Amino acid sequence: MSLRKKAAASVIAIAATFSLAACGGNDEDVIKVGTTDQGQEQWQVFQEEAKAQGLNLELVPFSDYSLPNRALEEGQIDVNNFQHLMFLADYNVNSDANLTPIGATEIIPLALYFKDHSELKDVEEAGEVAIPNDPTNQGRALHMLANAGLLELKDKSLLSPTPADVDTAKSKVKVTPVDAAQTVTSYPDGTPSVINNSFLSNGNIDPKSAVAQDDPSAPAAEPFINAFVTTEERKDDEDLKKLVDVWHSQKVQDAIDRQTEGTSVEVKKDGKELDEILTGIEGKIKDAK
C-alpha cells in the first residue's frame, strides 16, 4: 500500500478513536490523562504509582497528535502528556489557545530507522525518507536529516522548516511527510523513516537500531522537552501537579529507561520554568508568520 493510501486509512482510525474518547464518563474523582503511547510499560507503572498516592487515573488513548490538545480544550480530558514544548507552542499560536505546561518529563531523541540497515549510505541508496507531517516534528526531522548530511536546507536558521525549504538539488534523499503514526508502518515496507519513540513499540523497533538521531542532551534540544500540559484555569491544580512527581518516581523512571533502552533524558523543570521557554518559542513562531 502506498504511503498516501496508508495516511488516508489512518484518518478513519483516528476519527474513530476520538469519538470513543469523547464518549467517556464524567466521574469527578477520576483524572483523565491523554496520551498517544498508552501501551508502553511506563503508563501502567505510572497508573499504579498514582493510585498508591490516592490518585485515580483513566488513560485516554489517541492515535494522532492533533487530538489530545483539542480534547483538553473541550474538557474531554484533564491533562495530557504526549508533546514537547515546540509542539505545544505551535498549537497555541495557530489555534489561539493558551494551554499550559505544569511540569517537565523528559527529552526523547527523534531518530531515523531503516529496516535491516545501519548505515547512512543505505538510506542514500533508498532515496526516500518518511517523516512526521505535523509542523514541529517535521521541522525537527528535517534538521536532524540535514545534520546527518542527507539533505540540505535553504535556510538552516528556520525554527520549523518544511519540505519546501529543502534544497532538492543539493540533497541526497527526498522526504515524504506522513502522519506521525504512519511512519512506523512505512518502516517494515522498506522505507527509511523518522519515527518518534512513542511509536517504536508499535513496530517492535529497537530504539538503539537508529541509523541517525538528534542529541537530546544538547542545549538546542530545550524546545523538545516533553511535559504534562493542562488548561490555564487548572495549572495550579495540586492533584495534577502530583502527577509530575509520580512520573519522576524511581519505578516510573526505571520503566521509561527499559522502554527507551536508556535513550531518553529525564528533565526536572516546573511549570514556571517551562512557561518561560514556551513563551520564547511562541514569540519566534509569531515572528516567522
Model-derived regions: residue spans:
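An extracytoplasmic/periplasmic, membrane-proximal ligand-sensing/linker region
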Residues: 31, 38-42, 52, 190, ...
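Ligand-binding "clamshell"
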Residues: 90-102, 117, 189, 194, ...
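C-terminal motif of bacterial Sec signal peptides marking the signal peptidase cleavage site
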Residues: 18-22
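A conserved helix-loop-strand patch within extracytoplasmic ligand-binding domains
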Residues: 102-152
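A bilobed periplasmic-binding-protein/Venus flytrap-type ligand-binding module shared by bacterial periplasmic
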Residues: 109-121, 224-242
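Short, well-ordered beta-strand elements
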Residues: 28-38, 55-61, 127-129
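Short helix-initiation/N-cap motifs at beta->coil->alpha
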Residues: 59-70, 157-185
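Beta->alpha turn/N-cap motifs
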Residues: 64-65, 75-89, 106, 179-180, ...
